[in-house]
Amino acid sequence: MSDRLKPLIGTAATRPLTREEAEFAFECLFEGEATPAQMGGLLMALRTRGETVDEYAAAATVMRAKCHKVRAPHGAIDIVGTGGDGKGTLNISTATAFVVAGAGVPVAKHGNRNLSSKSGAADALTEMGLNVMIGPERVEECLMEAGIGFMMAPMHHPAMRHVGPVRAELGTRTIFNILGPLTNPAGVKRQLTGAFSPDLIRPMAEVLAALGSEKAWLVHGGDGTDELAISAASKVAALEGGQIREFDLHPEEAGLPVHPFEEIVGGTPAENAQAFRALLEGAPGAYRDAVLLNAAAALVVADRAPGLREGVEIATESILSGAAKAKVALLARLTNAA
């Protein structure tokens, strides 16, 4: 038990913690020095009052420092969502990652099992024949050889074992629900990140700015998803050069049609993998257009495309040329190599 943490729990309930106070508090959590009651008390005090940018940044800083790091190629990007939107869509960010990698941009994707759908990124990749339970060294090999690597959160954040049981018992959202996209083990400086609430995109952009990100789009779909929506306008907070610009983005701005939300609702990992394979073969429809929209945004963030319409063209070529499909096959081979 940490006696030094106890007063901070009461403090957190009444005022924002300074960055130094918050870093100390999360150091206690990640070192296993806090009791389950102290962990729960701190997390709920923050949740009830509302976490600040400094508190998010402090937690992310400590979590990054304790993770198993990965070296990524220059210019690597992460394409990730917080999860937790409860919408059960097809695996859009996962498919987007392979399309972007097929366009020549290194993708260091951080992810986990299902949070907001029946099939999270790791579930879909496993169904596609990839081994996601690999360590940092193997991920580095994938990034260098294939230009894409998947970092399974539990394989890179061992300190989370101390707080996992408490999170499960609390059964409610805490600060940890948004830390995943802020704690990429490869330390990427560019990312396309979705949030389960529009109220999070500005604070998350401010956190990434404080942590040294160069360019990022934080997005929330108008259909309630943690990605750019193909059925409605989306909210965007774009970080570049330390400045944050907020705007609405409609699919038609990228030259794409609007589709009913129901057309991107997913199912089991096997069903989602089947849809993913069809997309890689060039099947048209709402799923492909949703992936093209998100891939276009990622290509803009990566400075691979000057605008969304050009990004859609590049992403379309990645699919139709077979480049995205080839990335899946190569990553499957590399992750299953003896």
From Swiss-Prot:
Annotated catalysed reactions: N-(5-phospho-beta-D-ribosyl)anthranilate + diphosphate = 5-phospho-alpha-D-ribose 1-diphosphate + anthranilate
Ligand binding (5-phospho-alpha-D-ribose 1-diphosphate): 81, 84-85, 89, 91-94, 109-117, 121
Pfam families attached to this UniProt entry: Glycos_trans_3N (PF02885), Glycos_transf_3 (PF00591)
Swiss-Prot/TrEMBL cofactor(s): Mg(2+)
Cofactor binding comment, as recorded: Binds 2 magnesium ions per monomer.
Amino acids binding anthranilate 1: G81, N112
Its EC number(s): 2.4.2.18
Presence of keyword Magnesium: yes
Top-level EC class as recorded in UniProt: transferase
Pathway(s): Amino-acid biosynthesis; L-tryptophan biosynthesis; L-tryptophan from chorismate: step 2/5
Alphabetic keyword roster: Amino-acid biosynthesis, Aromatic amino acid biosynthesis, Glycosyltransferase, Magnesium, Metal-binding, Transferase, Tryptophan biosynthesis
General function of this protein: Catalyzes the transfer of the phosphoribosyl group of 5-phosphorylribose-1-pyrophosphate (PRPP) to anthranilate to yield N-(5'-phosphoribosyl)-anthranilate (PRA).
Protein known as: Anthranilate phosphoribosyltransferase
